Amino acid sequence: MKKKFLAILLVFVLFLSACGNKSSDNSKDSNKDENKKEDVVTIHMLVPGYDQGYLKEQFTDAIGRFEKENPNIKVEVISAGWEELNSKVVQLYQAKKAPDIMLLGSRSLRQFSENGILEDMTSMMTDEQKADYIENVLDTGKVGGKQFGIPMALSSRGLFYRSDLIKEAPKNWEELLNVAKENTKGNMKGFAIPTDLTSGTDEILNFIYQNGGKIVDENGNFVINSKENVETLEFFKKLAAYVPDPVSTTRNDQSKMFVNNDLAMYISGGWEKETMDKGMDKTPYKVAMLPEGKQKGVTIVTDSYTMSSISEHKKEAFEFIKFMGKLENQKIITAAYGWFPILHKEAEDPKYADDFNKPMRDIMEFGTPEPQVPNWDDFNKSFTIAVQKAMTGQLSPQEALDNCQNELAK
């Protein structure tokens, strides 16, 4: 009886031991699962206009594919309004909440790099990665030779004109003035010079560059009231009678006015194609290279991926930036708004040689990037107001630009 009892006791002990081991194994598995969860890193990316649909479809798709390839990295998007973007970046940085990645106009890189907000990504980029990019496009993301931004969008400009009214597009400023005058009839204006805060400066800069002007010199100092820039505004005054109100007209109004038979010519970029094609039957159009002043010129505009200097996940953030720079992903971004190639392989697409894109592609050979100023918002506001006052006769071109120079050079 005693032996039988000991045998039963032994079986019972072995059973408890097995249960204990199983429980221990379950605990280990649970710990593994928890460790996996702890290993997941969430990075945040600031995208202007995202809530209004800007690149929302493209980034939603790309983020989904990135997270599938990188299960330990999650990407969350933060939206901001275009006009508040730069101030939002400063506020978030000062509150120690700057997103890991921020989409910014390359024109603002000097401001944010000098303020310590941006991370220098020069050492993160391999030679192989750099070689994928068109060199002078990649250079728009540099400040003082350092790569504070990696371009993700590039736009150029063309002259859109009514092909049924204008037999040959104007090739220089004198011809532009004459054609604008000839086509200002009834409700139709011959040309447009928008001066809105959101986009007007880029369109004004086309003419500044065509006249051999600049905004800052080689040392980064303002030269806004230069002889060349005053001459540009004097030309604008000649055009003033043939353009819609420059103060209230925005760049986004131009294509709508064109298809409504209210405008004969305007300057803009590839994003206008959808609107223009819809009106082709009643308002046929063609695209030409921008008319030249003393020289050919166009404003080269890029937006860039940037990284916060206080990000705790710089490695993961750069992985996403690198992912977005792959050909298959960059092509989707470029196509979203009729932009132009960032990468060499993108430029091989034959569509950039068609009648719509070719004039905008060819003018980029004579392009100048937006000026890198100490504070873009301050410059943008002061400069556009100066142009408005000159065009509306409130001040002479010299007086308007003198005021702007004095205000910004303080």
Which sequence ranges carry the predicted segments?
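Conserved N-terminal structural module of periplasmic/extracytoplasmic solute-binding proteins
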Residues: 7-8, 20-111, 270, 292-295, ...
